[in-house]
Each structure stands twice: as C-alpha cells, then as structure tokens.
Regions:
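Hydrophobic core segments of alpha-helical transmembrane domains in multi-pass membrane proteins
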Residues: 9-17, 74-88
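Interfacial loop-to-transmembrane junctions
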Residues: 93-111
Length: 126
C-alpha cells in the first residue's frame, strides 16, 4: 500500500493524459458532427467565443472528473484532476504559447504531476 501511495501521482497524471486522448478521439472522431452542432448551439446561448471556449473547457473537465473518479474510486481525485487539467488548458491558451501536440501533452503531464506530488507530499488525505 505504501508503494501505491508513493506513485499515485504518476498514475493520476498518466490516466489524465489517457483521458484527454480518449476525450479528443471520441469528440473529434466519433461524434465530430454532433460536437460541431453542439458548439453552434452553445455559441448562440453564450453569445461570445470566449464564453464558448470556457464552456467547452468546463465540459471537458466534467468528462475528466467522471472518468478519473471511476478509475480511482475517489471523487476528490476526480475533482482535483479536472480542476488542474482545466487550469493548465486555460493558462496555455491565455498565455499564447505555441506548442506541438506532444509539447502540449508534456506541459499537462509535467504540471499535473507536480501538482499531485505537492498535494500528496503535504499529506492531504485522498
């Protein structure tokens, strides 16, 4: 059990990366037409591109929350993973940094790993 807790941050970061890939492949592959129509409906509701983008990021965070909560059987891990993933996405877009897809994935993995290492180092219960 001690080994599991010491490397839990790594598992969370890996499954969050896998979750992001699953989200991309499902939404832009399997449901691309629906996703585009949904974006049009949401844009009409929120009336600005920035709000549309924030709604998109929030919906993606919900996807990560559900998936990671199920995988780790922990609502806390699901919530924290979704929040840190959304925060990295928001920061990356606002900062204007141009990254390749691999660079973007590395940015997420690094920040999310550091976040969970610090969280577990602080001794917070999961």
């Amino acid at each position: 059990m001690v080994f599991y807790l010491e490397i839990l941050w790594f598992y969370i970061a890996v499954f969050l990366a896998i979750s992001d890939e699953i989200h991309s492949r499902i939404m832009w592959g399997l449901f691309a037409d629906f996703y585009i129509l949904l974006a049009g409906v949401i844009k009409e509701s929120v009336a600005s591109n920035i709000r549309l983008w924030i709604v998109h990021e929030f919906m993606e965070a919900i996807f990560h929350f559900v998936l990671l909560s199920i995988i780790f059987l922990s609502l806390e891990i699901g919530i924290l993973a979704a929040i840190i993933h959304m925060t990295v996405d928001l920061y990356h877009e606002i900062s204007g940094i141009e990254l390749t897809p691999l660079g973007h994935r590395c940015l997420h993995f690094t920040i999310e790993s550091i976040f969970f290492i610090l969280l577990f180092a602080a001794g917070l219960p999961t």
